[in-house]
Swiss-Prot record:
GO biological process: mRNA processing; RNA splicing; tRNA processing
Keywords linked to the UniProt accession: Chloroplast, mRNA processing, Plastid, RNA-binding, tRNA processing
Descriptive protein name: Maturase K
Cross-referenced Pfam families: Intron_maturas2, MatK_N
HAMAP family assigned: MatK
Stated role: Usually encoded in the trnK tRNA gene intron. Probably assists in splicing its own and other chloroplast group II introns.
Localization terms from the record: Plastid, Chloroplast
Species the sequence originates in: Plantago argentea
GO cellular component labels: chloroplast
Length: 514
């Protein structure tokens, strides 16, 4: 361990990441604007409350901002003027977003360099793992492992409420002190905005996603290390982490402050558990084990103290719920999953005597959360809150083919994402809402009723465009339709789904799994 610690310290001493001069380069903001998630962080007229900064973008604003940064000192800003100041120029709100967007692009550079260096010589593994990048790759793991487990900890990862916590986390990665001071000042400027002003602004998604991911990376680095110390079976790999950040320095602090003892290994030995699984998606993570309820309660207190002492965050134990898998629906990655007992009858025969044996087999069920789905569709104006399909007035001015293609795109994406559900009745209901909403939208455009429009266009008008892949197979091969129908009713995990964020239209994203 001392040799590894010495190597880590030597590697850190060689790192000289001077990122601060890049803040004054115009091309950085051009790259950041092109790669931005919102693509509209620059604007000339930020007067609209609902659509702020939606007008044409111009790098002239960036040039003026860089000129002001060269001339003025940020620490001499007058706090009396909330709209304009010496450093941030004509509009404090707009310039804060520009600076944060550019800084998000800049600070990713050391992460990318470390990632490239850590992956050298592993190109074959990378190419081989490209097919396993789907969100659905989690569910085969759950089906294979969760059926043997008893309890699960449903954890909501806390987000830091203070800017200084985020800055302290980044200092392990970014060795440039001026950049960290700049980040601290920019975050203070952003969070000093009033709440109504923040509601009108488009959140800088890329920047805050980066901050959150760095925060979670720090948490998981220490957590996985401690979990390995408390387990008979060490984790073979953990590919998400780019570097184990200050493990061996923090373990001494955790041993004296958090664990209240100097021997971390001896204390962790009290909760030895050979079978424990950890899965995270966005802000939620689950920790499942074969242990008893008492064992899981120990880990619950362990994690709460871990967040409070190491990250200086108040983490209430209510954020962690301990539930048995056999009667608990776990809301995770857009599914309601559970490991319930399913009866299975087996006929056995010994010589001339035959008898039936009733067995109970634990299987992982993945269900569609129908009520959140209907609520999401209602917000996107495809139906009302009761699930009754309605027309989409915004799309009524489009061409017929464009309307059908949009509805078909949404229907196919939802069908692919929820094709792994155990019960398809809810999926049929969602597809019915979208198909009838498409028919109502077309009837609204042609100023007719749905029945009259379908009679004029033909009964197969919508089926040709909204037919799913499974329906298409049954229609193409009618002789094998019975066998294909059995496949259609079974679970199908599409391993090419990484995200679905373009289901509704260009301005509003429908995310039915949240």
């Amino acid at each position: 361990m001392e040799e590894i610690q010495r190597d880590l310290q030597l590697e850190r001493s060689r790192q000289q990441d001077f990122l601060y001069p890049l803040i004054f380069q115009e091309y950085i903001y051009a790259f950041a604007h092109d790669r931005s998630l919102s693509r509209s962080f620059l604007s000339e007229n930020p007067d609209s409350e609902n659509q702020v900064y939606e007008n044409k973008s111009s790098l002239l604003i960036v040039k003026r901002l860089i000129t002001r940064m060269h001339k003025q000192n940020h620490f001499l800003i007058s706090t009396n003027d909330s709209k304009k100041n010496l450093f941030l120029g004509r509009n404090k709100d707009l310039d804060s977003l520009i600076l944060l967007e550019g800084f998000a692009f800049i600070v990713e550079i050391p992460y990318s360099l470390r990632l490239i260096s850590s992956l050298e010589g592993k190109r074959k593994k990378i190419e081989k793992s490209q097919t396993l990048r789907s969100i659905h790759s989690i569910f085969p793991f759950l089906e294979d492992n969760f059926s043997h487990l008893n309890f699960v900890l449903d954890i909501l990862i806390p987000y830091p409420v203070h800017a200084e916590i985020l800055v302290q986390t980044l200092r392990y990665w970014v060795k440039d002190a001026p950049s960290l001071h700049f980040l601290r000042x920019x975050l203070n400027d952003y969070w000093s905005l009033s709440t109504p002003k923040k509601a009108g602004l488009k959140r800088n998604q890329r920047f805050f996603l980066f901050l959150y991911n760095s925060h979670v990376c720090e948490y998981e680095s220490i957590f996985v290390f401690l979990r390995n110390q408390s387990s008979h079976l060490q984790s073979l790999s953990f590919g998400v982490l780019l570097e184990r950040i200050y493990f061996y320095g923090k373990i001494e602090c955790l041993g004296s402050v958090f664990l209240k003892v100097t021997d971390c290994q001896a204390n962790l030995w009290l909760v030895k558990e050979p079978c424990m699984h950890y899965v995270r998606y966005q802000r939620k993570c689950i920790l499942s084990s074969k242990g008893t309820s008492l064992f899981m309660n120990k880990w619950k207190c362990y994690l709460a103290t871990f967040w409070q002492w190491h990250f200086s965050l108040w983490f209430h134990p209510r954020r962690i719920s301990t539930n048995p898998l056999y009667n608990h629906l776990l809301e995770f990655v857009g599914y309601l999953s559970s490991a319930r007992m399913h009866p299975a009858m087996v006929r056995s025969q010994i010589l001339e005597n035959s008898f039936l044996i009733n067995n109970a087999i634990k299987k992982v069920d993945a269900l569609i959360p129908i009520m959140p789905m209907v609520t999401s569709l209602a917000k996107a104006q495809f139906c009302n809150l009761l699930g009754h399909p309605t027309s989409k007035p915004v799309w009524a001015d489009l061409s017929d083919s464009n309307i059908i293609n949009r509805f078909g795109h949404i229907c196919r994406n939802i069908s692919h994402y929820y094709s792994g559900s155990s019960k398809k009745k809810s999926l049929y209901r969602i597809k019915y809402i979208l198909r009838l909403s498409c028919a109502r939208t077309l009837a609204r455009k042609h100023k007719s009723t749905v029945r009259t429009f379908l009679k004029t266009a033909g009964s197969g008008f919508l089926e040709e465009f909204l037919m799913s892949e499974e329906d298409l197979l049954c229609w193409t091969f009618p002789k094998a339709s019975s066998a294909l129908w059995g496949v259609y009713k079974s679970r199908i995990w599409h391993l090419d789904i990484i995200w679905i964020n373009d289901l509704a239209n260009h301005k509003k994203n429908l995310r039915p799994w949240k």
